[in-house]
A protein has these predicted regions:
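Hydrophobic cores of alpha-helical transmembrane segments in multi-pass inner/ER membrane proteins
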Residues: 173-179
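Perimembrane loop-to-helix junctions flanking transmembrane segments
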Residues: 149-159
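Bacterial N-terminal signal peptides
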Residues: 11-22
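Alpha-helical transmembrane segments
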Residues: 127-131
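Alpha-helical transmembrane segments of multi-pass membrane proteins
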Residues: 133-143
């Protein structure tokens, strides 16, 4: 019986805050008409953009006949549309569902698995914090389990059942597949990329989680055994770490990263992942330390894969003409 509520409340609050935070710390062809459009202003200055070179020349004769000299006959500003530039960047970052994608998963697994060989001092410090947090929850595991049991109700069970689904691959993978199709048929490169990286993160994180489960062989809370019951090197018991939590955090991290410009995406993504992790404790499927390590594993695995894909897409250049009352020229943007 859980007698002292202080450790339980502290541990639950700490766990929730951590996983809500998500842990401690090829360009396609664009036609000119697709890239340029008329607008009333840009983030830099008010003005107008142009649809193509012809309309640009016809609008007050900006170019002479041989196109070698640029002359200003209007005080208005002409620039490419920010919205079109964003579309171009998304196209440059496109990830295709092809043979290279599948081959890349295997190389990414090898790179991620050997990441500790390339860690610097800050990485090792982060790993130490995670190990310390896992150890802390390991000490409090049984008290936290008892605290959840004492506060359990049919309403909480219903909420837990709802959020458990987000960590179920039979549901999350088809959902990601549907999101990819939405991006593919809707010509939304960001949606395609997000879905494909999320699927890869799910698979890679799931593999690492399975290896750890088999290595630890920890008994689940539902068995009635103590939190210190580890058989080691067995598939009979797979409590440590939580697979639902690790994979849902892997997906949430990708979505939050790819849609970081949308304010509500990050809190919703990590909020759902947090509730999924807590549902596993409520349902006595996992100890709190299982959930804590699972969240960290999913988060940092996805961060590593996102960096890999960022490197793979290369350093792209965006070039567009710009003319204003002070002169004209070519704007060259480099994406790192």
């Amino acid at each position: 019986m859980f007698r002292n509520p202080i450790p339980f409340k502290f541990a639950t609050f700490f766990l929730s805050v951590f996983i809500m935070m998500g842990g401690w710390a090829y360009a396609d062809d664009f036609s000119e008409s697709e890239f340029f459009e008329e607008s009333n202003g840009t983030e830099d200055s008010p003005g107008y953009s142009f649809e193509n070179e012809k309309s640009f020349k016809e609008r007050n004769n900006f170019f002479d006949s041989n196109l070698n000299d640029l002359k200003i006959t209007d005080s208005r500003t002409y620039t490419s549309s920010p919205r079109k530039r964003e579309r171009l960047r998304d196209s440059q970052n496109r990830l295709n569902f092809d043979r290279d994608y599948f081959y890349g998963i295997f190389s990414d697994i090898a790179y991620t698995a050997t990441s500790p060989l390339r860690w610097d001092d800050s990485d090792w410090m982060t790993a130490a914090w995670i190990a310390g947090g896992t150890s802390l929850f390991f000490i409090l595991d049984e008290e936290i389990r008892d605290g959840f049991e004492d506060n359990r109700s049919s309403t909480i069970d219903d909420v837990s059942e709802f959020f458990e689904r987000f960590g179920n691959g039979a549901i999350s993978l088809p959902a990601l597949g549907a999101f990819y199709l939405y991006g593919y048929f809707g010509e939304n490169a960001k949606a395609e990329r997000t879905a494909l990286i999320a699927v890869e993160s799910f698979l890679v994180t799931g593999l690492f989680t399975t290896v750890l489960k088999a290595t630890a062989g920890r008994h689940r809370p539902s068995t009635g055994d103590s939190a210190t019951s580890f058989d080691g090197f067995t598939t009979d018991h797979g409590s440590f770490p939580s697979g639902h939590t690790s994979t849902v955090f892997a997906i949430a991290t990708v979505i939050a990263n790819e849609y970081e410009d949308v304010p509500y995406i990050e809190p919703i993504s990590y909020g759902i992942a947090t509730m999924t992790g807590l549902s596993r404790i409520n349902d006595e499927k996992h100890w709190a330390s299982d959930v804590f390590l699972g969240a960290a594993l999913g988060y940092f695995t996805s961060k590593t894969l996102l960096r890999l894909h960022s490197d793979k897409k290369g350093q792209h250049f965006t070039i567009y003409p710009r003319v204003d009352r002070n002169g004209g020229g070519i704007v060259l943007g480099k994406r790192f």
